[in-house]
Amino acid sequence: MAIDSKPHDDLQLFKTNLHPCGYWPDRWASDLVMDPNDPRLGAIYPQTLAWGFRRSGNLLYRPHCEHCNACVPVRVNVNAFVPNRSQRRCLARNATLVTRIVPAERNAEQLSLYRRYLHQRHPDGGMDGHGAIEFDQFLIGPWGYGRFMEIREPATNGTPGQLLAVAVTDLIHQALSAVYTFYEPNAAARGLGTLAILHQIHWAQREQRPYLYLGYWIKDHFKMDYKRRFQKLEIYDGYCWRPFSTTYPTTHTL
């Protein structure tokens, strides 16, 4: 991966020890992590997204595995995005739901939904025991970029409807970044994960941000391959962003 860090030539990157891969159970992984003690992280965070990094709490990282380059950074060119038939059906199916943007501040309702989601959708994934502290550490960034996009049932007699999904989103200059989305596991038929991305795309369009960063696409992975459906998609090849291709080889040049 190439990093044009000027005027940040003294940025420090650390490579983590090997750890079990979170996507392929038979593989080991490692990451590049920017120095978490660097006081400039908040200021350069928007640029690191363009370098293929992601945020987890106050950590900025990207996969850097010796024998695998399956994790490919992707972003949606929102001005060129055209929903496909399935996505249009998803929007129509959920047309009565209410979306609002709120500050990235945890409340009991969000925490309850988060814990139900992890318990039912990701049991034994290492996160199903998360509580309030882990919620804050994982989802709420320290630099003020974060917002929560809530998706709810319609209000009844002035009372807010049931909270169905929360899309943790960073709002930066030139882009939005989809950090993490959790939703009501018993409403999976609604396609709430897809709906959240569609609303994030519309949000970026309204804010005149040309890109929505979706993290990493992994070809043929049952949880990560869905990102290819949001076209026009772009991939980061280690040097620059280019149009999405399922056959384009990636590199680990640094």
Curated annotation (Swiss-Prot):
It catalyses: N-terminal L-glutamyl-[protein] + L-leucyl-tRNA(Leu) = N-terminal L-leucyl-L-glutamyl-[protein] + tRNA(Leu) + H(+); N-terminal L-aspartyl-[protein] + L-leucyl-tRNA(Leu) = N-terminal L-leucyl-L-aspartyl-[protein] + tRNA(Leu) + H(+). It holds the Pfam family ATE_C. It is an enzyme of class 2 (transferase). Transmembrane segments: none annotated. One of its GO terms (biological process) is ubiquitin-dependent protein catabolic process via the N-end rule pathway. Keywords: Acyltransferase, Cytoplasm, Transferase. It is found in: Cytoplasm. InterPro entries: Acyl_CoA_acyltransferase, Asp_Glu_LeuTrfase, N-end_Aminoacyl_Trfase, N-end_Aminoacyl_Trfase_C, N-end_Aminoacyl_Trfase_N. GO terms for cellular component: cytoplasm. Its EC number is 2.3.2.29. GO terms for molecular function: arginyl-tRNA--protein transferase activity; leucyl-tRNA--protein transferase activity. It comes from the Bacteria. The keyword Acyltransferase applies. Functions in the N-end rule pathway of protein degradation where it conjugates Leu from its aminoacyl-tRNA to the N-termini of proteins containing an N-terminal aspartate or glutamate. PANTHER family: ARGININE-TRNA-PROTEIN TRANSFERASE 1, ARGINYL-TRNA--PROTEIN TRANSFERASE 1. Belongs to the R-transferase family. Bpt subfamily. This is Aspartate/glutamate leucyltransferase. It comes from Xylella fastidiosa (strain M12).
